[in-house]
């Protein structure tokens, strides 16, 4: 039962900047996790790592290998993306407003409060302190909000809230006044600053600064002789019309011989930042000492809207600007020609970024939890994903374990592809919260129950609501099920305490089951019999024979409110959970209690900020609200008002394992001990909303209602969502399960879908390397290298290099992503190769070793599987015809009398 975290679905984008690497790989923060989406394959995966709180800043290395993730508590993770592991950790001393790798990948610029710090990127050598700070610029008068490196990684353009942008020379210069150049004239914060490059010389000749009030400043650079003699006084520098001579902003070398009235700043002389040799400096022009001229100032004309996100593409000379009213503009620079001006939503855009080629634009809206990628040339969407805005209430697997359906308080039903991690259907017909879901056995239709008084049936082929089940008097439905044959649909109510039974085909009410005296929150048909089990807050579980119309067959009484009910897959056992934290197991045939599990202590843990008692004494309110049997019925999963999902062995009534659904401190109930100094007269200080979201740039939070305390005269705060699990569902294959939690839908799986391939790091993947591996009898490695090269002749050569006795071992070592290519090669060999038994042996071992993987990815592998089936069928037919012909010939020869 080695379940591991595999993916996160349904979680909304909650803010922070998105990053695109390798032109098609979109990296975005999802709470305290990182989501990676391959736009070319439409595949999304969430990395199996967490930060302490919600992520607010991301930055990737130029080659896309490393990722920096900074959370709200200034803790930074240095992540290796190919291996999906955290390499290093560091904590900054103040809020991080901007973060960026240098183009050469050697340095990292971090805007920490008013400071700009230059850190050396961790290398491949092991070190006690992998991060090395090599320089600090303390020239800004307010928070730094934007950074941009020059192409040669020698200059840094910094924008801040003090209405100015500064150009720094990162290197230390000998005998030259290292004073930052100021770009002034802005009337609001500089939210974006970028370098423009001359396409002929590939040198910086322009700069663009974007103010929060919607004005774009274009600056031109002119080289001039600014070299200084070592004996020349610093005051001999001719003052620039846009650079005031401020003594407190000058950074000089220690003992550099500049005027004594200038303030000296001692800095660490970091390796790699020292100046060039004196002989090389004679012919060098320093960009921060040259002449910068304001060429033009253009306004976006968005009235009272503010700029909240922007990006610039050097190759296309284009600027994209996102505003607080949901409008974005795409402009051709430097002439400021508007190419597109469109509205995405009515909420502010929190991120806007180009891809490497510049043909795709990525936008994020934290208020709506929406992330989309748009091709501005063809005006089409490449990706449009939006998680559930509110908590997910229910989740269920399809019978083939390929699809996952979710329903939430935002009145929407979403259907997800489990393998790709993307949502491909969203149904919005419900007008109130969706409370229950049920997949039909045909795998093509879904039932959903809602508080709006309807039960709807959805068709996946036509993407529509083909039938709606209602009652004469509107009722609120909180539970739903259907019989295994799909003829009857049943739903339990919240207000009338009844169970309605409809005919699935006609939609007419067949029966109304009465007897419960409280809301019916649990409902399930027996998998093998015609019994219907219902649980209610009236301390009872009732069994009904719906088809015989006999009413209640049997009643199981409890000592507390019954919250949910679940049948074992064989239908001979029934599990029910109660408000006191117990799980009761009943024999449905004999009608007796078999086992009882005391789970209150197992689910205990986590203290909410408004709790008056400690976590150790707060277990009285903990209970299991959802249960789910395993495919074989040997263990059961239980979860509820806690941060844990518990797995129990039913026969021994012992806790096998406990899964913590999140370590995100932005949620309430994660910690066992709270800091007493954070308690004030108005309540916990963390629940007081004292931040101004309009000034937080790309950071925004979703509104979850008035959950906390309010200050007099201030608007109600948003509070913190409480961590819990509302629904569980185990895949029919038994190899994965899904949990609808506060963070989203977590998927845990036994199958290790990610296997790190060391050959991905090799630079010598050549045909010669394949030949050498074959000669060294490393056929597994040779096969992997040949499939990476994707050369058909090499792949076939490696297949024949494997001895028949070693085929099984080599087949097991083949990676999942190479299965399709290997099958295509086997199909070609079946059609053109005389070694039929050898190739069939390969096919047999591939199917044995990767059967579960092929079943999970059958949609992707379907073309290769069909080709393989056709090739085998054709070979079988040819052999059958030959054998039949030979058989008839032998019969004829045997029947001919021997005349000799």
Curated annotation (Swiss-Prot):
Tree of life domain: Eukaryota
Gene Ontology terms: cellular component: Cul4-RING E3 ubiquitin ligase complex; nucleolus; nucleus; ribonucleoprotein complex
Ranges of Acidic residues composition bias in the record: 275-284, 687-697
Null allele phenotype: Impaired maturation of 5.8S rRNA, especially the processing at the 5' end. Reduced siliques size due to defects in embryo and female gametophyte development. Defects in guard cell function leading to reduced stomatal conductance and impaired water-use efficiency.
SUPFAM superfamilies: Quinoprotein alcohol dehydrogenase-like, WD40 repeat-like
Tissue: Expressed constitutively and ubiquitously; observed in seeds, seedlings, roots, leaves, stems, flowers and siliques.
Alphabetical keyword list: Developmental protein, Nucleus, Phosphoprotein, Repeat, Ribonucleoprotein, Ribosome biogenesis, rRNA processing, WD repeat
Protein's cellular compartments: Nucleus, Nucleolus; Nucleus
A Pfam entry, by short name: Utp12
Region described as Disordered: spans on this chain: 228-284, 684-720
Ranges occupied by WD repeats: 10-47, 50-89, 91-129, 139-178, 185-229, 302-341, 344-384, 387-426, 429-468, 472-512, 515-554, 557-596, 619-658, 720-759
UniProt modified residues of type Phosphoserine: 275
Biological processes per GO annotation: embryo sac development; regulation of stomatal movement; response to sucrose; rRNA processing
Residues annotated as signal peptide: none
CDD domains recorded: WD40
Compositionally skewed regions (Basic and acidic residues) per UniProt: 261-274
InterPro entries: G-protein_beta_WD-40_rep, PWP2, Quinoprotein_ADH-like_sf, SSU_processome_Utp12, WD40/YVTN_repeat-like_dom_sf, WD40_repeat_CS, WD40_repeat_dom_sf, WD40_rpt
Induction trigger: Induced by sucrose in guard cells.
PANTHER family (alphabetical): PERIODIC TRYPTOPHAN PROTEIN 2 HOMOLOG, WD40 REPEAT PROTEIN
Subunit architecture: Component of the ribosomal small subunit (SSU) processome. Interacts with TBP1 in the nucleus.
Function comment: Involved in nucleolar processing of pre-18S ribosomal RNA. Plays a role early in ribosome biogenesis, especially in the maturation of 5.8S rRNA. Required for guard cell functions.
Annotated family: Belongs to the WD repeat PWP2 family.
Identification of the protein by name: Periodic tryptophan protein 2
Lineage, opening ranks: Eukaryota, Viridiplantae, Streptophyta, Embryophyta, Tracheophyta
Gene name of the encoded protein: PWP2
